[in-house]
Swiss-Prot record:
<dbReference type="InterPro" id="IPR031157">
    <property type="entry name" value="G_TR_CS"/>
</dbReference>
<dbReference type="InterPro" id="IPR047872">
    <property type="entry name" value="EFG_IV"/>
</dbReference>
<comment type="function">
    <text>Catalyzes the GTP-dependent ribosomal translocation step during translation elongation. During this step, the ribosome changes from the pre-translocational (PRE) to the post-translocational (POST) state as the newly formed A-site-bound peptidyl-tRNA and P-site-bound deacylated tRNA move to the P and E sites, respectively. Catalyzes the coordinated movement of the two tRNA molecules, the mRNA and conformational changes in the ribosome.</text>
</comment>
<keyword id="KW-0963">Cytoplasm</keyword>
<dbReference type="InterPro" id="IPR035647">
    <property type="entry name" value="EFG_III/V"/>
</dbReference>
<dbReference type="InterPro" id="IPR027417">
    <property type="entry name" value="P-loop_NTPase"/>
</dbReference>
<dbReference type="Pfam" id="PF03764">
    <property type="entry name" value="EFG_IV"/>
</dbReference>
<feature type="binding site">
    <location>
        <begin position="17"/>
        <end position="24"/>
    </location>
    <ligand>
        <name>GTP</name>
    </ligand>
</feature>
<feature type="binding site">
    <location>
        <begin position="140"/>
        <end position="143"/>
    </location>
    <ligand>
        <name>GTP</name>
    </ligand>
</feature>
<dbReference type="InterPro" id="IPR005225">
    <property type="entry name" value="Small_GTP-bd"/>
</dbReference>
<dbReference type="GO" id="GO:0005525">
    <property type="term" value="F:GTP binding"/>
</dbReference>
<dbReference type="GO" id="GO:0005737">
    <property type="term" value="C:cytoplasm"/>
</dbReference>
<keyword id="KW-0342">GTP-binding</keyword>
<dbReference type="InterPro" id="IPR020568">
    <property type="entry name" value="Ribosomal_Su5_D2-typ_SF"/>
</dbReference>
<keyword id="KW-0648">Protein biosynthesis</keyword>
<dbReference type="GO" id="GO:0003924">
    <property type="term" value="F:GTPase activity"/>
</dbReference>
<dbReference type="GO" id="GO:0032790">
    <property type="term" value="P:ribosome disassembly"/>
</dbReference>
């Protein structure tokens, strides 16, 4: 089967936005106008095509990036293939956004014309900046009360520190919003608001003529800056033709020198078709962006893979989803080469082979089986056993590891238990499935309490995990309060000589151990034997190590696991008949309990590396608040038009921080935190913790 669409006619893009900027409605309209959807699903009715998980429909927010393939005939009559990835707009799902940005070639940033640039827009914009994703801006909801296009454009500069290139002006606003002025063609486009109606093209209204001339002048000035020859011609008084202007705008957009700004209202069906034309005109195809970098597995040298069907196959798994009909689906972006159903691929990250079963083209939640896929495609693969998010799949003869995605460590933990015994096994299966889908979600078992602990990026993140468990896996669970993972250690050296004796009837038990316990730098446990002359026979020494390790999980102060302990067995004694591995295990356990107390046990707490990105106005408040949380400020730096505050703060003092920061900065500052190291707890705080856990 040959390629149906040339790679230069592909557009892989996503729509990124603040939580209520109208992203799902916009995606629905795009799917409708590109002919895939016959009935538009309105988000406020809970019936949208892209939001295919129940919770998304209930909450009216988009959680999972569903990838959709659709087609659009541009102004030139050529059909283009669009692969659209819907991205979430809530701060707890930024991991989803990172994943989709990683595999996109371009993006549309939606703004609410009333609110302009909102906090989550800033966060997502920064993430897109990290991956240098070319972006256009669409000022949506122009029909809303308080809609202000010019203020939104100003905020793109002041809040995002980005260069806005205005390519359309609105005709009217709020209830009087009729359409747009196309500044390239210098024509007015108006819509009557009915679904699917084409634009009526006419002359620019007389009251907008002057403004349109002024903005076209600015547009040309910014566009010619990206090309030396065009700049020289312009300075000599030669204006670019409309065709040249489009290619200059495309060049500047692809090189991320500026961002074209359009406007409209998706809900009222005004401005959607010109946006689709702009995707074709201005956003890159897979061959317009730099080739993806990777590591050649054989030589360990850096290499690149060109977006070509003739290059060796390489693809990146960026999402795993559970599909009720197909089972587990792995979404992949093919960067180079082509792939047939049924072939064997290598997962170079896991060092495992994968056989390719079904290959699907996804349309939101319907699917189409395909035999072959090509460079630039986004496909869903069924039946992969080993592959998880961020893994590379490639030609086994030309192995490569593409750039890995980086996922932050989870920062919040809660205990979870099934409501009934019958749910115990189902809960384990459900949690493991969900953890395979989402690398920012972890599951572990607490050895002391036997409880299952789940960890994630925030409270909403874990709420939704629990909710999905109930809906998709029919598991009801009780959820505890968020907890801090404390640890214990020792501060000085202690030598313990302990004898374990049991000789009352039957087989006796005897073991004597002399052990030195001392602190060491690392977090692990080190065991060493310095026995000479057979004071403890060789076969019993592993029993000593096993005995100490078995009680390292529960320290003497509050029962937390111990870190950074070294134990050296220096002497001992045994009995020919009564000694055994078990007897030495018991003796070592008791010796450790004595030793931990005598070696000055102390409580340790997790210290988080916190980064707050805030507008300058709130820097003082942010620093003051972090200090009040026992935080150590390690520095501040400018990033664009914002300030980054770096600090080390105990996790125990960070609960509820998101709400404090939100209210302190009117929702404009964001923070990320990840575990850095353990540190001794101040004595006053340690006493409270011991009381609580004793």
């Amino acid at each position: 089967m040959a390629r149906e669409y040339k790679i230069e006619d592909y557009r892989n893009f996503g729509i990124m936005a603040h939580i209520d900027a109208g992203k799902t409605t916009m995606t629905e309209r795009i799917l409708f106008y590109t002919g895939k959807n016959h009935k538009i699903g309105e988000t406020h009715d809970g019936a949208s095509t892209m939001d295919w998980m129940e919770q998304e429909q209930e909450r009216g927010i988009t959680i999972t990036s569903a990838a959709t393939t659709t087609f659009w005939e541009g102004r030139d009559g050529r059909k283009r293939r669009f692969n659209i990835i819907d991205t979430p707009g809530h701060v707890d799902f930024t991991i989803e956004v990172e994943r989709s940005l990683r595999v996109l070639d371009g993006a549309i940033a939606l703004l609410d014309a009333n609110a302009g640039v909102e906090p989550q827009t800033e966060t997502v914009w920064r993430q897109a900046e990290k991956y240098r994703v070319p972006r256009m801006v669409f000022v949506n909801k122009m029909d809303k009360i308080g809609a202000d296009f010019y203020r939104s454009v100003e905020m793109v500069g002041s809040r995002l520190g980005a260069k806005a290139l205005v390519v359309q002006l609105p005709i009217g606003a709020e209830n009087d919003f009729e359409g747009v002025v196309d500044l390239v063609e210098m024509k007015a486009l108006k819509w009557d608001g009915s679904i699917g109606a084409p634009a009526v093209i006419g002359e620019i209204p007389s009251d907008l003529k002057e403004k349109a001339e002024e903005y076209r002048e600015k547009l040309i000035e910014m566009a010619v800056e990206v090309d030396e020859a065009a700049m020289e011609a312009y300075l000599e008084g030669v204006m670019p033709t409309n065709e040249q202007l489009v290619s200059l705008i495309r060049k500047g957009t692809v090189e991320v020198q500026f961002h074209p700004v359009l406007c409209g209202t998706a809900f009222k069906n005004k401005g959607v078709q010109p946006l689709l034309d702009a995707v074709v005109s201005y956003l890159p195809s897979p061959i317009d962006i730099p080739a993806i970098k990777g590591i050649d597995v054989k030589t360990e040298a850096e290499t690149t893979r060109e977006s070509s069907d003739d290059a060796p196959l390489s693809m990146l798994a960026f999402k795993i989803m559970n599909d009720p009909f197909v089972g587990s689906l792995t979404f992949c972006r093919i960067y180079s080469g082509k792939v047939h159903k049924g072939v064997s691929l290598e997962n170079t990250v896991k060092k495992k082979k994968e056989r390719l079963g079904r290959m699907l083209q996804m349309h939101s939640n319907s699917r189409e089986d395909i035999e072959e896929a090509f460079a630039g495609d986004i496909v869903a693969l069924a039946g992969l056993k080993e592959t998880t998010t961020g893994d590379t799949l490639c030609d086994p003869l030309k192995p490569v590891i593409l750039e890995r995605m980086e996922f932050p460590e989870p920062v919040i933990e809660i205990a979870i238990e099934p409501k009934t015994k019958a749910d115990q096994e189902k809960m384990g299966i459900a949690l493991n499935r969900l953890a395979a889908e989402d690398p920012s979600f972890r599951v572990k078992s607490d050895e002391e309490s036997g409880q299952t602990i789940i960890a994630g990026m925030g409270e909403l993140h874990l709420d939704i995990i629990v909710d999905r468990m109930r809906r998709e896996f029919k598991v009801e669970a009780n959820v505890g309060q968020p907890q801090v993972a404390y640890r214990e250690s020792i501060t000085k050296t202690a030598e313990i000589d302990y004898t374990h004796k049991k000789q009352s009837g039957g087989a006796g038990q005897f073991a004597r151990v002399k052990i030195v316990f001392e602190p060491h730098e690392g977090d692990d446990f080190i065991f060493e034997s310095k026995i000479v002359g057979g004071a403890v026979p060789k076969e019993y020494i592993p029993g000593v190590q096993k005995g100490i390790e078995s009680v390292m999980g529960s320290g003497p102060l509050a029962g937390f696991p111990m870190l950074g302990v070294k134990a050296t067995l220096i002497d001992g004694g045994y009995h020919d008949v009564d000694s055994s591995v078990l007897a030495f295990e018991i003796a070592a356990r008791a010796a450790f309990r004595d030793g931990a107390k005598k070696a000055g046990a102390q409580l340790l707490e997790p210290i988080m590396k916190v980064e707050v990105v805030t507008p300058d106005d709130y820097v003082g408040d942010v620093i003051g608040d972090l200090n009040s949380r026992r935080g150590q400020i390690s520095g501040t730096e400018a990033r664009g038009i914002a300030t980054v505050v770096n600090a080390m703060v105990p996790l125990a003092n960070m609960f509820g921080y998101v709400n404090t920061l939100r209210s302190m900065s009117q929702g404009r500052a964001q923070y990320t935190m990840q575990f850095d190291h353990y540190e001794p707890v101040p004595s006053a705080v340690a006493l409270e913790i011991q009381k609580k856990y004793a």
